[in-house]
């Protein structure tokens, strides 16, 4: 369903409603014979032309140009974009909720937040805020906590 929405609208919406675009339904080339970026509509048009051409006059790489071959890449790209962007939305919301409650992260790396902790009560409070930052999720979020004297030694 995500692929059809992305293909039809050239965009998808993240968990927080943020718009992620798919410019002109472009796909990266996955063979040596293709240019770095190809517009799907042009690929489909070229495929129709190839099928109308007698087989002996078709280019050597004509089977590589089948648009169905690239549908898997488009599905992967649209799902990956949705998952990664929604995870970023969730991390931003968790950061905001933590800051609103007086817990300021010192460092963020992708989906990890590093806090300076003074007592165990802060750990439980931060963990609960992060796990419940988007309560409408059907699958609950789980937060792994690592403690240490430095970020590298946290376990």
Predicted regions and their residues:
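Conserved catalytic core of nucleotide polymerization and phosphodiester-bond processing enzymes
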Residues: 1-155
